């Protein structure tokens, strides 16, 4: 190098610089041109790498948008997926625009673009499947609405049909009661005629008729109502004879010819017996025919209600199975739904067979059958549509994976091409530098030494980057010459390489996140299945407890929000049934308590009646004393002042006694009215027994010879019921007479009280009106004697009321026993400790 320096030292500095710089400039120019070419190639490759990285991120967004579309298939989510697909198509087109058809990676980009177009087609298929599913779901919802409406209409119509049959049966029973009233009237007249014929004297005959006149007038009122329209004249004739008989009995003179007239009236009444019995028999025959016609209708109404309930229960189970199927549209759930629909069809066929001739059954059966078929067909199509949608989504996901693989392969090809181009650029740069060194070896040794260091550093840095050492620092980036540009281009390459690696790491993280999201979705589906299974098991346990009579068992654990209404409806149904039985128990307890209270009241009434009798005796004695006092007052005018004082005290005591007697008679009258109501209940019971005996006789007559013995027993029961009814009517008549007598006695006692008040006033005036006292005393003595007679009669009636109160007490205990039996029937159900303890408390009382 010394000789070069000596050679150059002979030239001027500018010439030397020019001589030294010219070869250096030439070599640098060659290296610069080579660097520019390499930098352009690298920038193009890095732009393509950026587009590929953006596409990879975008396809992750596409996959996430497709998952959202599958979970919630809406127009917004569909538009979002297409928007993401359009963005990826634009990115792929931008990457392809930088390549020629023969460039490396062109085939991979074309494959990815074709797969992207296929995804667009599959999205259209998914949307069409969603539209089919929405149509099928709407059809199922519409069919379910028809089923619910038809279910309610069927139950309402069946209940109305059953009620109409019951109404016809009640009408037939009422006609049977009319026949019984007709026969009872004829039997009563015959018995009264026999009693009159067996009289010992005329007075006894009149008393017998007078005693029976109240009941006879009752028959007079009831008979025209009970007779059929064509037999109304018989009722008028019966009423005319009863009025004639009443007029003869009410005749105070009672001449002997009245006996003949009474016998004539009885003869006319006897003549009415046969046509009245014929009318009653005709009514009973008509009732028997009606009962025969109603037997089939009653049985049919029971079967219709039974089949309707079976169909209703099957529909409820089908609705539960349908709810489970809509949450999990699997073949297994569809099979379960089909099984329940088959049960509904069987129940519907049974109802159609039973009630086929009824208009409501045929109309609703057609609607229900059509709805069952529609739900079953829609469920099958839903299973297929759900499977197709899953397949289409999986195919789209596979195509996205294929696109990712193609883009990754394209990125690898671009990476390899960039490496080769980098090596080519390095070789060109080294060749240019060697050539420049050779050309300027002598003349530009110093300049070569000056340029060799930076170029060597850049070369080494490029080798390190090509070898994967991305942490290598790029020197000379701040130079303004071509070396600086090469350093900056190299730094951009390093930065893009780092970004690509970071992008690959983020893509891996997003793939892991997508896998975790799929696992969460599967866990959510498993949780929903468990919630449905729990709800079904809880309902099954509740129904089993209800079947065993445990009405206190409810479902306390809440279901899932979508299923919790089943739990609340079930609990409400159990609570309603339990409350109904509790109401029955409460009513039975009230009847039980009322029966005991009636018995105790009757017992207390008997005791008070005895006390009243004693009080009446004391009152009679007091009245006798008053009579004696008044007589002595007339004879002993001289002792008027002392007598006035004593009479005033006696009058005050008598006023108190009369007030007590009036109040006691009021209580007796109220008790008699209550006893009358009890007698009406007993009469109704006797009528029901008579009705049952008559029905038994009709059935025995149908049985022929085999039913004769049963017919005899039924006749005996019927006669016993008639005697019971007759006894009840006699008691009612006695109570009516007692009530009338008590009312009369109360009036007399009230008059007595008024008289005693007048006595008190007159006693105050005795001092100045001694003579008037004597006259008034005689008048008062006469009045008080009449009062004494009335009190004696009242005492007899009071004794009779005591006997009736004892009979009422016995009837009340019988009523209480029947209420106890009803309580035992209700106690078979488990209605809770509170209700049970209340029942035991009532029984203990």
UniProtKB/Swiss-Prot annotation:
UniProt subcellular location: Cell membrane
InterPro entries associated with the record: HAMP_dom (IPR003660), MCP_chemotaxis (IPR051310), MCPsignal_dom (IPR004089)
HAMP domain: residues covered: 451-502, 530-582
Secretion signal span: none
Transmembrane stretches, start-end: 17-37, 430-450
Sections of the chain in a coiled coil: none
A single Gene Ontology CC term: plasma membrane
Keywords: Cell membrane, Chemotaxis, Membrane, Methylation, Plasmid, Repeat, Transducer, Transmembrane, Transmembrane helix
Pfam families: HAMP, MCPsignal
Residues in Methyl-accepting transducer domain copies: 587-816
Protein family according to the UniProt entry: Belongs to the methyl-accepting chemotaxis (MCP) protein family.
Free-text function comment from the UniProt entry: Chemotactic-signal transducers respond to changes in the concentration of attractants and repellents in the environment, transduce a signal from the outside to the inside of the cell, and facilitate sensory adaptation through the variation of the level of methylation. Attractants increase the level of methylation while repellents decrease the level of methylation.
Identification of the protein by name: Probable chemoreceptor y4fA
Organism from which the protein derives: Sinorhizobium fredii (strain NBRC 101917 / NGR234)
Organism ancestry: Bacteria, Pseudomonadati, Pseudomonadota, Alphaproteobacteria, Hyphomicrobiales
């Amino acid at each position: 190098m010394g000789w070069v320096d000596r050679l150059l030292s002979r030239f001027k500095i500018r010439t030397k610089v020019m001589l030294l710089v010219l070869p250096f400039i030439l070599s640098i120019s060659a290296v610069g041109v080579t660097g520019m070419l390499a930098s352009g190639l690298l920038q193009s490759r890095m732009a393509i790498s950026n587009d590929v990285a953006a596409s990879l991120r975008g396809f992750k967004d596409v996959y996430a948008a497709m998952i959202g579309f599958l979970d919630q298939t809406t127009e917004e989510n569909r538009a979002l997926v297409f928007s993401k697909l359009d963005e990826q198509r634009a990115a792929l087109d931008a990457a392809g625009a930088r390549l020629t058809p023969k460039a490396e990676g062109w085939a991979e980009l074309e494959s990815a673009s074709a797969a992207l177009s296929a995804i667009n087609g599959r999205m259209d298929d998914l949307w069409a499947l969603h539209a089919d599913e929405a149509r099928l779901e709407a059809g199922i919802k519409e069919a379910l609405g028809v089923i619910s409406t038809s279910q309610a209409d069927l139950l309402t119509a069946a209940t109305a049909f059953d009620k109409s049959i019951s109404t016809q049966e009640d009408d037939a029973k009422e006609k049977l009661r009319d026949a019984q009233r007709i026969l009872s009237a004829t039997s009563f007249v015959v018995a009264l005629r026999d009693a009159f014929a067996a009289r010992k004297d005329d007075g006894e005959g009149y008393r017998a008729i007078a005693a029976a006149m109240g009941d006879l007038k009752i028959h007079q009122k009831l008979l025209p109502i009970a007779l059929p329209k064509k037999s109304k004249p018989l009722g008028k004739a019966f009423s005319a004879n009863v009025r004639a008989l009443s007029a003869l009995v009410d005749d105070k003179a009672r001449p002997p010819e009245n006996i003949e007239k009474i016998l004539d009236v009885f003869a006319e009444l006897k003549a009415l017996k046969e046509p009245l019995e014929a009318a009653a028999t005709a009514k009973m025959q008509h009732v028997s025919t009606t009962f025969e016609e109603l037997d089939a209708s009653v049985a049919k109404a029971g079967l219709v209600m039974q089949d309707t309930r079976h169909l209703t229960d099957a529909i409820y189970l089908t609705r539960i199975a349908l709810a489970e199927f809509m949450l999990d549209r699997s073949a297994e759930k569809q099979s379960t739904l089909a099984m329940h629909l088959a049960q509904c069809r069987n129940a519907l066929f049974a109802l159609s067979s039973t009630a086929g001739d009824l208009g409501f059954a045929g109309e609703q059966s057609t609607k229900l059958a059509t709805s069952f078929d529609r739900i079953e067909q829609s469920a099958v199509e839903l299973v297929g549509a759900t499977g197709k949608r899953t397949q289409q989504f999986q195919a789209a996901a596979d195509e996205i994976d294929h696109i990712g693989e193609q883009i990754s392969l394209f990125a690898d090809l671009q990476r390899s091409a960039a490496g080769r181009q980098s090596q080519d650029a390095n070789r060109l740069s080294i060749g240019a530098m060697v050539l420049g060194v050779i050309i300027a070896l002598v003349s530009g040794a110093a300049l070569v030494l000056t340029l060799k260091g930076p170029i060597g550093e850049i070369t080494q840095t490029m080798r390190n980057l090509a070898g994967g050492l991305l942490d290598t620092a790029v020197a000379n980036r701040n130079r303004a010459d071509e070396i600086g540009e090469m350093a900056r281009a190299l730094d951009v390459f390093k930065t893009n390489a780092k970004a690509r690696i970071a992008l690959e790491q983020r893509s891996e993280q997003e793939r892991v996140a997508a896998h975790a999201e799929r696992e969460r979705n599967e866990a959510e589906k498993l949780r929903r299945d468990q919630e449905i299974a729990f709800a079904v098991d809880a309902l099954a346990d509740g129904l089993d407890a209800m079947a065993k009579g445990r009405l206190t068992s409810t479902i306390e654990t809440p279901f899932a929000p979508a299923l919790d209404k089943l739990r609340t409806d079930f609990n409400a149904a159990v609570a309603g049934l339990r409350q109904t039985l509790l109401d029955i128990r409460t009513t039975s307890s009230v009847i039980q308590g009322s029966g005991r209270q009636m018995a105790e009241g009757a017992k207390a009434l008997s005791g008070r009646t005895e006390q009243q009798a004693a009080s009446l005796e004391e009152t009679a004695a007091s009245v006798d004393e008053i009579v004696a006092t008044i007589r002595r007052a007339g004879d002993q005018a001289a002792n008027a002042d002392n007598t006035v004082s004593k009479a005033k005290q006696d009058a005050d005591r008598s006023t108190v006694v009369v007030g007590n007697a009036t109040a006691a008679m009021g209580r007796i009258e109220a008790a008699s009215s209550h006893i009358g109501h009890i007698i009406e209940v007993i009469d109704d019971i006797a009528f029901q027994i008579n009705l049952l005996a008559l029905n038994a006789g009709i059935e025995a007559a149908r049985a022929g010879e085999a039913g004769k013995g049963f017919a005899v027993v039924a006749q005996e029961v019927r006669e016993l019921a008639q005697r019971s009814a007759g006894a009840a009517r006699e008691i009612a008549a006695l109570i009516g007479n007692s009530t009338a007598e008590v009312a009369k006695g109360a009036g007399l006692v009230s008059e007595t009280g008024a008289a005693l008040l007048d006595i008190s006033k007159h006693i105050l005036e005795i001092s100045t009106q001694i003579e008037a006292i004597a006259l008034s005393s005689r008048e008062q003595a006469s009045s008080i004697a009449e009062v004494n007679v009335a009190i004696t009669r009242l005492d007899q009636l009071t004794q009779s009321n005591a006997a009736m109160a004892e009979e009422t007490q016995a009837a009340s205990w019988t009523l209480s026993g029947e209420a106890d039996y009803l309580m035992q029937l209700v106690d078979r159900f488990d209605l809770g400790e509170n209700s049970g303890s209340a029942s035991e408390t009532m029984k203990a009382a």
